[in-house]
């Protein structure tokens, strides 16, 4: 965010940040990629924002910047230890703007480790 965010914008930023955290918390070997998407998507739906989350939640990163496993509602791919994926839910309001919160994470034997270290608070 550049500039001062009104309360409504701050709520959206908090909602997308929390959705992203919930998606990360699902990550571990053996989980379907679609479950990560569902964790993000269901939280945003509870906040009334489902119609504004119009893309998948993430993807693998390896030899290509965008590759399998694809993290979206239709993915049947199973997450594996040592894969690197992004978790990047976003909400886009026509005529207002959008918010996307993204981390790149390593799938570990017990869950995940964030590889990105950007702060989650707004940049003013």
Q: What is the role of each PLM region?
A:
Residues 1-124:
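Active-site neighborhoods and metal-handling regions in enzymes and metal-associated proteins
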């Amino acid at each position: 965010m550049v500039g001062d965010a009104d309360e409504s914008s701050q709520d959206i930023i908090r909602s997308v940040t929390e959705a992203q955290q919930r998606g990360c918390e699902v990550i571990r070997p053996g989980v379907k990629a679609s479950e990560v998407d569902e964790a993000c998507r269901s939280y945003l739906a509870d906040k009334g924002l489902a119609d504004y989350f119009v893309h998948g939640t993430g993807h693998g990163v390896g030899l290509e910047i965008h590759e399998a496993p694809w993290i979206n509602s239709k993915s049947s791919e199973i997450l594996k230890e040592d894969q690197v994926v992004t978790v990047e839910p976003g909400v886009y309001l026509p005529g207002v703007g959008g918010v996307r919160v993204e981390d790149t994470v390593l799938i570990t034997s017990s869950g995940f480790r964030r590889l990105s270290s950007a702060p989650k608070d707004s940049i003013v």
